[in-house]
UniProtKB/Swiss-Prot annotation:
A Pfam family matched in the record: PBP
Applications (biotechnology): Phomoidrides A and B (also known as CP-225,917 and CP-263,114) are potent inhibitors of Ras farnesyltransferase and squalene synthase. CP-225,917 and CP-263,114 inhibit Ras farnesyl transferase from rat brain with IC(50) values of 6 uM and 20 uoM, respectively. CP-225,917 inhibits squalene synthase with an IC(50) value of 43 uM and CP-263,114 with an IC(50) of 160 uM.
Name of the protein: Phomoidride biosynthesis cluster protein B
Highest taxon of source: Eukaryota
Assigned protein family: Belongs to the tstB family.
Biological role: Phosphatidylethanolamine-binding protein; part of the gene cluster that mediates the biosynthesis of the antihypercholesterolemic agents phomoidrides which are dimeric anhydrides. Within the pathway, tstB is not essential for dimerization and its function has still to be determined. The pathway begins with the highly reducing polyketide synthase tstA that catalyzes the formation of a C12-fatty acyl-ACP, starting from one acetate and 5 malonate units. The hydrolase tstM is involved in the release of the C12-fatty acyl chain from phiA.
Cited SUPFAM superfamilies: PEBP-like
Species of provenance: Talaromyces stipitatus (strain ATCC 10500 / CBS 375.48 / QM 6759 / NRRL 1006)
């Protein structure tokens, strides 16, 4: 075998051993594409460490808005049959490294008359300078006591970005213009917290006054005087080198 080919194979084996020793046996055999992927991961980790203190934008969470003046704390308990009580650690299947499904959530039948619910998911630890919206869902019937993946199947989308989903809920705006953004915190940025806020409304939202894809701020203003309670479920997820 020519010396050049032998040297090239030896270099590939060295790279392969280096990558495997750092990332573990799950990492694929070294190649130009895998080495480039590894370099990009290192750059992501470095940037995340530089931005590590950019987190904790809890003041920007939806329930910190003026509409919650009478109810600064949750009034009912939300839990997840799949993941457990609030504060759970999300499995990989709930992230962008897995199927990216939303956790199944449940809450008790309300003791007061709820016209409808508004559901918002957000991450206050994203290094964006504000809480990052992952999902907004309007017009959830007041007799509902659960929410999950089956509600969010995308059936279609028009030219204005209006999405039709299996539940019939109106989908609000997130930064990717999708039905839901599954967790994918930057590698090296540590655990991120994900807040799922279930807001009970004493009056229904007026669809004539909502934009086709309502924003968090738009809804925050619209529900002033309509909040009659709310529940909160949180979870954490951290991206690992081995993912």
């Amino acid at each position: 075998m020519p010396d050049g080919i032998v040297a090239s194979e030896a270099k590939d084996n060295t790279n392969n051993n280096l990558v495997h020793s750092f990332l573990g046996p799950k990492f694929p055999a070294a190649s130009e594409s895998s080495i480039m992927w590894f370099i990009l991961r290192c750059l992501e980790w470095t940037l995340a460490k530089l931005l590590y203190r950019r987190r904790g934008y809890d003041h920007d969470l939806f329930y910190k808005g003026l509409a919650f003046g009478k109810y600064p704390n949750p009034t009912f308990t939300v839990t997840s049959p799949d993941c457990g009580p609030t504060g759970a650690k999300l499995g990989v299947e709930y992230s962008q490294w897995g199927s990216g499904k939303v956790p199944q959530l449940t809450w008790p039948v309300s003791g007061i008359e709820v016209k409808e619910y508004l559901i918002i998911s957000e991450d206050p630890d994203a290094p964006l300078g504000h809480s990052n919206v992952h999902g907004i869902y309007c017009f959830v019937p007041g007799n509902k006591t659960g929410f999950g993946p089956d509600d969010l199947e995308l059936l279609g989308e028009d030219k204005n970005g209006l999405k039709q989903i299996s539940s019939g809920y109106l989908v609000g705006k997130n930064r990717r213009n999708t039905v839901y953004i599954a967790p994918r915190p930057p590698l090296g940025h540590g655990p991120h917290r994900y807040f799922f806020e279930i807001v009970a409304l004493s009056q229904p939202l007026d669809p004539e006054k909502l934009s086709p894809v309502p924003t968090k701020q738009e809804l925050s203003d619209m529900i002033i005087g309509k909040v009659c309670g709310w529940g909160l479920w949180t979870a954490t997820f951290e991206q690992k080198w081995s993912m």
